Amino acid sequence: MATEFQTFNEDLSLTSQTECEDSARAILAKLRPEWTSSEIKFEYFSVGITNKIFSAGFGTEHVIFRVFGHNTSKVIDRENEVTAWRQLAKHGFAAPLYGKFNNGLICGFLEGKSLKIEQMRDSRFHMNIAKRIAQLHASVPTNGKTLVFEKMQEFLKQLDPKFEDATKQEFFVTNFPQNLAAEIEKVEKLVIKSKEPVAFCHNDLLVHNIVFNGETKRIEFIDYEYAFPNYALYDIANHFCEYAGVEGTPDYTKCLTKDEKWLFINDYLHFKDSKNHCDVRMKAMYKHLPLFEATAHLFWAIWALVQAQNSTIDFDYLTYAHARYEQYEKRFQKYIGSVNHH
């Protein structure tokens, strides 16, 4: 079976299933020449809110096609995605990457099913998720520099201060500050001051990106579009924000309790470095947690504003951006309150 990374000059249609499958067959004729074209079976997964994802199967073998959503290169660095993915695959944290086409990637199939939100909220899964995050942070090398604030500023450059739709424009002006760049800088100063360590992070551990293999009982992460070196605590904080769910309006009352967050951080530290696991580190992480939750909310709020202007996917990005921005303000104030209190 060919394992070297291959490039294909094909565009897969986001709108026509027939055209999309014809292009996929053309790619598979080169990537998997031993597969009988007419017997290839396609199965669609539409859980991502950015891309179109489907599998192509022949016999017991499968490969996954990820077709990038319209205009997503405005919010995703595709070069970085390939580099990060290959590095993660090398360390056993991602399915193998077989190749790329003009508007997407082809990768291996990870056995298992994405967690459902009820499962993710089940405390029995928390330890396994914490363990896998710890393993990721401990295993993949970085240069110690984070890109998270740079990415936010890049998103802002893509954001047009004027929405074409008057109703959307009014909503934007009413619910968001004029100077979002100042918000980023305000948070960045405090985050740098926290001196939290940097690790190679997934940065998007929502429910769809966490796969559980019922046979091996292992947790795996998928979808490394936003993977880059970042503060380790950001990865955890961002994951905590995702307990609210993605579909419809997020429900932040469903997030973990203080005690559950404490236990999760305790498990994470135990698996990451059991020899140096101490209360001081634990308390520092817990103290800084609202600041990093605020950072994650701000990141996705700005991301969603850009998506609201560019994405063709049927999702109310503007309402989502507002929900995230409100949480950003709440978590930021909680952090400021706790710091001033001590």
Regions found by a protein language model. Give the residues of each.
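Short proline/glycine- and basic residue-enriched helix-capping loop/turn segments at helix->loop/beta transitions
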Residues: L180-I184
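ATP-binding pocket architecture of kinase catalytic cores
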Residues: E43-N179, L190-P197, E215-T216
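Helical subdomain adjoining the active site within ATP-dependent kinase catalytic cores
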Residues: Q169, H277-H342
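Active-site acidic catalytic loop and adjacent metal/ATP-binding pocket
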Residues: S46-F65, E185-F240, G245-E247
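Active-site activation/catalytic loop segments of kinase-like enzymes and analogous catalytic loops
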Residues: L233-N276, A294-T312
